[in-house]
């Protein structure tokens, strides 16, 4: 996992808020985020935003693609954001639209899983639901069995226009089940961002998995794999909820 001790000590509250907005804007648009866009959101001048962006870039949290004047989050930026989501140090206003979208998602998961009397069908429905709700590849492992869904959907994301990235993801998937079996990530929710993926450091994807108990294995996992450009707050919540639902019904 990326170490961010210096960042925690040096970043200001406004810089945290700007980083959050860059991450959320980039997740929606897949386009580098410029200072003019941020200036409108924060009600300050573009020059002020450019100065704050320069500081975030110096801290390694955002970067400037060669072909754009805007900025994109780095793996370290995503890690800082996710860490603060998990420990509650960074709280953001959720729009009514976002709240209702999440509630519809959890309801859809509950209905689809709870209606299944057989474990295999429930797991497949859970994986399919995560694919539909997040646009990522959905996966689950129970013992030595791996469930996958949504590979074609994953590769429609703009990040995977590059065949090199597709090949890196394919290699990661080939080794995913053996790695989960051996490494057995122990947290209820595990997030591996970009270079943190031990079996796919160059794949530029994030793996978000929830560990859950089942009658078949005490090391069962369900989650998603997708580009590092994610709506982490929503996806993490949906993955955690799905794992909890499977624990209840299996």
Report residues per predicted region.
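Conserved RecA-like P-loop NTPase ATPase core
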Residues: 18, 74, 224
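N-terminal helix-turn-helix
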Residues: 21-28, 32-84
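Intrinsically disordered, acidic Ser/Thr/Pro-rich low-complexity regulatory segments
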Residues: 79, 86-250
């Amino acid at each position: 996992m990326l170490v961010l001790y210096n960042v925690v000590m040096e970043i200001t509250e406004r810089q945290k808020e700007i980083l959050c907005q860059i991450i959320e804007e980039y997740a929606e648009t897949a386009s580098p985020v410029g200072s003019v866009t941020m200036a409108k959101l924060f009600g300050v001048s573009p020059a002020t935003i450019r100065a704050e962006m320069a500081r975030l870039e110096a801290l390694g949290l955002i970067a400037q693609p060669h072909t754009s004047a805007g900025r994109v989050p780095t793996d370290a930026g995503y890690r800082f954001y996710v860490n603060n989501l998990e420990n509650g140090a960074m709280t953001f206003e959720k729009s009514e639209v976002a709240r209702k979208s999440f509630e519809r998602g959890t309801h859809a998961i509950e209905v689809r899983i709870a209606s299944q009397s057989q474990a295999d069908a429930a797991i497949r429905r859970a994986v399919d639901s995560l694919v539909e709700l997040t646009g990522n590849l959905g996966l689950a492992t129970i013992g030595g069995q791996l469930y996958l869904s949504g590979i074609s959907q994953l590769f429609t994301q703009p990040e995977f226009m590059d065949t090199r990235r597709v090949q890196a993801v394919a290699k990661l998937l080939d080794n995913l089940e053996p790695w989960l079996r051996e490494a057995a990530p122990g947290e209820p929710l595990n997030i591996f961002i970009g270079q943190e993926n031990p079996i796919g450091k160059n794949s530029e994807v994030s793996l978000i998995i929830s560990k859950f108990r089942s009658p078949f294995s005490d090391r069962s996992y369900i989650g998603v794999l997708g580009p590092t450009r994610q709506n982490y707050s929503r996806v993490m919540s949906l993955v955690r909820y799905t794992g909890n639902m499977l624990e209840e019904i299996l």
